[in-house]
Amino acid sequence: MSLDAATLALVAGELKNTLLDAKIDKIFEPTRDEVLMTLRTRTETHRLLLSARSGSARVCLTKESFENPLTPPGFCMLLRKHLTGGRLIELRREPGDRIVYFDFRCTNEMGDLVTNTLAVELMGRYSNLVLVQGGRIIDALKRVDFDDSEVRQLLPGLAYTCLLYTSDAA
């Protein structure tokens, strides 16, 4: 079942109430389309599942156990580098659309505080996770180059633009 914008608004509100100010403890990529984060609040530990599977894209808290690969995939390693230890300072969504932004306050390799945003785009077969800093893409779970799309590319270093779903129906 696909997640519509109204349902996502409710889910995002619940996640914000539960996870705001939580600290990222661990990050895993159990499958090529899913990321699992362990976040700690002052009182609890939560497991956040971010799925970019085309048939079941979703964002939710889970108690389910996942088997992780022995060697973490590249995107997982990148998320660990840029997000582990960061605090969730804001959770927002694109109004009327199926995109949720997780803003994390993190320390970079120079020791400076930076805000890294994980954009979770839940758009059916175009679902994706995109890590952004300062409006520029650090990387995406599913890279999109010009051969894949003339409209929007998702490659490291490019400016991030959100994918807005528009209907041409009159």
Describe these PLM feature segments.
Residues 1-164:
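Acidic, proline/glycine-enriched N-terminal capping motif
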Residues 165-170:
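Conserved small/polar residues in nucleotide/adenosyl-binding loops
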